[in-house]
Amino acid sequence: MPVTRRRLLLVVPAALALPTLAPAAALRVPPLALQSWRLPNGLQVYALPDAAAATVSVQVWYRVGAKDDPPGRSGFAHLFEHLMYKGTRHMPAETIDRLTEDVGGQNNAFTVDDVTVYHSEVPANHLEPLLWAEAERMAHLEVDQASLDSERHVVVEEYRERVLADPYGRFFEALPALAFDVHPYRRGVIGRIDDLRAATLDDVRAFHRTYYRPDNAALIVAGGFDVADLARWVQRHFGPVEAPGTPIPRVAVVEPPRRRDEARRLAAPHVPLPAVALVWRAPGAAHRDAAALQVASALLAGGHSSRLHAALVRERHLANAVGFGADLRADAGTLAGWAIAAGGVPPARLLGVLAAETLRLAEKPPSAAELAKVRAQLTTAALVERETPAGRAEALGWALVLRGDAHAADRALDELQAVTAADVQRVAREHLLRARRVALTYVQGAPG
């Protein structure tokens, strides 16, 4: 889940009242109007011009995320995201706010495992100053001890609020660690308090030198602009930024296969009702099964008409809330189903029914109507995202980071619509039924 500088929105979509799409009615969506080039310093530039747009979205995607946190510095990529809003050699702190909010625009940022993204939207005639500001903080960030202490405090309080104070914060934080034994995906994006407190100014400077460089970034600009103007401004402001001669460190950890099923128990204070989870490892976002796993996830928990909600909440009254997610990242992924018990329901019973209903997808494929509805939901969500410049830029960025190809944003829509019931049953058998899993029981008690 993305961690933002100012806010974190976790949206669980309800079932959409949409007409079903028969396979013959598959949509043909025009591809993104993409133009791209690379500067001599390695910066990748992607332009998505739209003559009808009155605004422009500027996004800088740095290929550094929580998986790249230095040893003993969990949460550092996220902490650094906050520090990028401090001053630079030629730009006082809060300048990004003045260049966006003061002209009716907005800005924000988020950090996930594979990437850190800075995104702004302004009226189209304010594009060049924003490009200057992004190049300036890429090249000349300056952070002092007071700024580090201030932003560290913000992030520590974020951890307290989202993980320690939330009755189920520890529960959801534990799921990645259950999926991975050695890959840094097992760490939380926000980090641990002791690691955050250990960060130093030297750490900050080294991190910026190592990862915040033109050859580790993609600049995506979408909206109302002329491509020739954009190319001239990008060269003017980003062209002089030098790329270090040192290589960029990359995570090369290969997760060993899980040999057996495991069961874990986690206790935490102030847990009003027990919760359970089942966690499997999954392939990465570029895998051929990614679209089918996305469809399978939506069939299981995509709103109130989904299989898990119907079986555990509406019909049997075993759970107050359920979910299932296919979190497919660049290197690998996880599949996780979870449920929060209804009053008086033993965790063991809830876990058994959760497992049975999840694995039933491998035995009973979706009906034509069920599959068409889910495909319509997912396709509609993707099309709604593309209605704005910011949404089109973000779709392109995710394709670039997770699949290594910006054009995969277009193929993804066709791949979703091509998923069949047999595909869903096949991936459920391969990645759920035949795969090893970890079962978690979460209860009230003293933390271990």
Annotate the PLM regions.
Residues 66-72:
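Short pre-active-site segment immediately N-terminal to the catalytic Zn-binding motif
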Residues 23-66, 90-126, 162-216, 240-287, ...:
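Non-catalytic beta-strand/loop surface segments
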Residues 74-88:
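Active-site SXXK
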Residues 1-15:
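N-terminal secretory signal peptides and thylakoid transit peptides that target proteins
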Residues 86-90, 121-152, 303-304, 327-385:
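M16/insulysin-pitrilysin zinc metalloprotease superfamily fold
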